[in-house]
A protein has these predicted regions:
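N-terminal glycine-rich phosphate-binding loop and ensuing alpha1 helix
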Residues: 1-61, 293
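A structural signal for short hydrophobic beta-strand segments in well-ordered beta-sheet cores
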Residues: 25, 143-145, 196, 208
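Conserved beta-loop-beta/alpha segment of the NTase-like Rossmann-fold superfamily
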Residues: 61-62, 67-147
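Catalytic-core segments of class I nucleotidyltransferases/pyrophosphorylases
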Residues: 46, 100-101, 108, 114-121, ...
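Phosphate- and divalent-cation-binding pockets in alpha/beta enzyme and binding domains
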Residues: 13, 59-62, 91, 112, ...
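Generic beta-sheet signal
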Residues: 6, 28, 52, 77-79, ...
Length: 293
C-alpha cells in the first residue's frame, strides 16, 4: 500500500505562519503537521509515500528528504502550477499502480487508517471517502450514504439552507488507480467537485467510511490554535509522547532550564534549549531561551 500526501498548499489563511513555510510545515507542538501525518502512516505500516509539492516545495524536500530519518520511503511529485486536489494526485500517477491512500499533509488526525483500507477492500470500492461528524459542516463537503455505505449525495461547502447532513468529507481517500484515468494529466481538477460527481453519475462503487477519533483541518489560525491545544490536552492519540509530563499539563523535551522562582501555567510545551524565567502560560510551545512577562 502506498500513500499520497498532498502537501502543495500555500495556507493563505494561516499567515503570517505560512509566509516563509508551506502549510504542511506549520508546527503543531513538537513537530510539523506533515511530520505527524508521516508518523500516522508509519504506525499503520504504510511506508511508501508520494508527496505532492508546489508552494515552497524545497522546504518540504529538505525537511523530509528520502524519508529514511522517518522510517519511510518518500518520492516527490512537483506541480509547476496548482492543479487542484485531483490534478496533483494525477500528476503523481506514474508512482501509483495499485490501491493507494490519499491524505492531506495539513490536517491533524489519529484515524485508524488500517480500518479504512480494510473497509475499502471489503466493499470492493473504486473510491472510499473517509467521513466525520462535525457540528458545523459549512466549510466542508457534506455527504450522505445509504445503509450499505454507498455514497448517494454530496454537496461541497453548502449554505445552511443546503445542509442535509453533519457528515463531512475529510479529504482522506482510498482509491483504485483506475479513477485517475478519468482526467488527462496537467489538467486542474478537484476530487470533490469533479471526480466524485463523475463516479456517482457513472455508478462506480464509491463508499463512505464514518471514522471515529480526532480530525481537524489546520486551515486557519483559529483551527491551528485549537489543534495545538488539543494535542497539549491529550485529545489526539499521537504515535509518541510529545515530551515528559512534569505536572499541570506541562510537557518538556530535551535540555530545559526552569528557574526556581518561575511560575508556569499549563498547557505548555517546552522544547530543547528553553530557559524559563518569570511567568509563562498558557498554550505556549517554546524552543530556545525566553524571559516570561
Amino acid at each position: 500500500m502506498k500513500a499520497v500526501v498532498m502537501a502543495g498548499g500555500e495556507g493563505s489563511r494561516l499567515r503570517p505562519l505560512t509566509i516563509e513555510r508551506p502549510k504542511p510545515m506549520v508546527p503543531i507542538v513538537n513537530k510539523s503537521v506533515m511530520a505527524h501525518i508521516i508518523d500516522l502512516l508509519r504506525q499503520h505500516g504504510i511506508l511508501d509515500i508520494v508527496v505532492t509539492v508546489q508552494y515552497l516545495a524545497n522546504e518540504i524536500q529538505q525537511a523530509f528528504g528520502d524519508g529514511e530519518a522517518y522510517g519511510v520511503n518518500i518520492q516527490y511529485s512537483l506541480e509547476a502550477t496548482p492543479l487542484g486536489t485531483g490534478g496533483s494526485v494525477k500528476n503523481a500517477q506514474e508512482f501509483l499502480d495499485d490501491t493507494f491512500l490519499v491524505i492531506s499533509g495539513d490536517a491533524m488526525t489519529d484515524f485508524d487508517l488500517t480500518a479504512i483500507i480494510d473497509y475499502h477492500r471489503e466493499k470492493k470500492a473504486m473510491a472510499t471517502l473517509t467521513l466525520y461528524h462535525v457540528p458545523n459542516p459549512l466549510e466542508f463537503g457534506v455527504v450522505i450514504c445509504d445503509e450499505s455505505g454507498s455514497v448517494r449525495q454530496f454537496q461541497e461547502k453548502p449554505s445552511w439552507g443546503e445542509v442535509f447532513s453533519d457528515t463531512i468529507n475529510t479529504g482522506i481517500y482510498v482509491l483504485e488507480p483506475k479513477v485517475l484515468d478519468y482526467f488527462p494529466k496537467n489538467k486542474n481538477f478537484d476530487f470533490s467537485q469533479d471526480l466524485f460527481p463523475l463516479l456517482l453519475k457513472n455508478g462506480d462503487p464509491m463508499y463512505g467510511y464514518v471514522a471515529s477519533g480526532y480530525w481537524t483541518d489546520v486551515g486557519s489560525i483559529q483551527e491551528y490554535m485549537r489543534a495545538t491545544a488539543d494535542v497539549l490536552y491529550n485529545k489526539v492519540k499521537l504515535t509518541e509522547a510529545i515530551g515528559d509530563h512534569i505536572g499541570g499539563d506541562i510537557f518538556v523535551k530535551g535540555d530545559v532550564e526552569i528557574a526556581a522562582d518561575a511560575r508556569l501555567y499549563g498547557p505548555i510545551y517546552l522544547g530543547r534549549g528553553v530557559k524559563i524565567k518569570g511567568l509563562a502560560g498558557d498554550f505556549l510551545c517554546l524552543k530556545g531561551e525566553t524571559d516570561g512577562n
